[in-house]
Amino acid sequence: MKIYSAYLTLFSFVIIISCKRDNSYDLDNYLNRFESFVENTENNYNSDVRSQKLDSFNDFIERKKDFKLSSENIRTINSLEKRFENILENTPSKENPYSINFYFENSASMNGYLEGTEFLKVMYRVVGNIQNYDNKSFFVNSNEHQQSNILEKINKKQIKVGDISNSDHQFIFSNAINSASENNSLSIVVTDGIYSVTDGNIDIVPIKIEQAFQKSLKSKNTETVVLKLTSKFKGTYYSETCQPGKKAIKINQSRPYYMLLFGDSSVIDKALKDIVNVTELPGYNEQARFLSSLQSKPIYTILSQGEEKIGHFKPAKRGSSFFTEIIDVEKSKASRYSKGENKENVFQFGVAVDFSNTDLPNSYLEDLGNYSISQEMGYEILDIQNIDDVEKNSRTYKELNKIQEANKVEFTHIITVSAQTNLFGELEISLNKNLPEWIKESGTTNDCEIKGEEKTTFAFDQLIQGISKAYQKKSNNSNYLTINLKIKI
């Protein structure tokens, strides 16, 4: 019996040792296989095998529960997980394929830009970036002409394809937006923005473009981004308004050109980050974005403290740091913290807003002309300040930090409103769907005196106005959002 017990004890000990060795072997094998899997994925990853790779990754994550891991093992596994997550973030998914159509307007009026260093740098940057995606490239005028090695042809000034005497922007834009809508893809158009008015009537330009866009926007929420850039132009400019025989004008100067992007919100956001990043584009000037409606409504709160505040009020709900209704409102005389020259007999406060999900450029959000406020009350908007510009030692900055930490939010802007009369009621602040001021300033009705003119483009404002109206009509709404506040005695 004792001999049997001894054998049993020895047998159990051997099993334990064996299990420990097997476990150690399995763990080493697991870590080696996991690392090989991640390396292989980094080197050979494409969207077609995404789901298969993701399933394998999940298996590895599930398996780690089988082992007793040291702190070093945990760090190794966390590092491998992070590497794989980075691959997912930077690779288009099978479920949401990301393809790109690149359209280069090749009318004769584009030839002058091919001498410009800034223009060529932008083309190299953008066309180079789209090579990381499924893509097709086209020269476009009144038809599209698919091209291989389009960058090489642009660089060698070999862009004469099709009818280069005329550009049909209705066709170009409709074609681009339809391509983006059909496959949840991105369309990029490069153009000089000059609208060819064959019948001489510039007033019908916005109507034609609006109608073309309305058809394309009917069933999709495609967005449009317009970028204005500048480059050297050396060559012949073809005027739309000069008399026959005087339309071809030799110039050597800077001229604006434009890049338009079409796609849904997520596609546009990614494109502006990875493909057409404006910080990497020499000659970039301005940006506008057109959309039917916001993906989400912004959050906002009245600031109970800060340099913006003149007068007295309390939150309607006691103990709240996040509120849109105030009571016990009183005007105040001058304050050493007050903004503006006339600080007597004034009531004023700031509203912190999170515009981060609106998709609209800062230049649009910070333009006072794009806002309206309840006319029946006596308030006006004094200022729209970016949070990044708030002084770090100010009372406003401290108040913002307190609210953000307590409510797990991050604001982007402060809207300051002020009134001397009609203080009480329901105050509405609306962000309207306006044509950005820079677009209005970029258009001209006379391009005959083109020498020395480096900022305007014939009928460009009319062209973009048509796009803007199409988006307004799709949503049947003249504003993007409304901030609602209640102010009581």
What are these regions (language model features)?
Residues 143-186, 195-196, 223, 230:
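Von Willebrand factor
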Residues 20-22:
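Bacterial signal peptide processing site
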Residues 15-18:
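C-terminal motif of bacterial Sec signal peptides marking the signal peptidase cleavage site
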Residues 33, 40-61, 135-160:
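Short beta-strand-loop
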Residues 311-489:
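Extended non-globular C-terminal regions
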Residues 220-352:
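Eukaryote-biased recognition of electropositive, low-complexity segments
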Residues 104-107, 184-199:
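DG-centered beta-turn motif at the end of beta-strands
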Residues 45-91, 97-98, 108-135, 202-218:
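…and closely analogous acidic/polar surface helices at protein-protein or active-site interfaces
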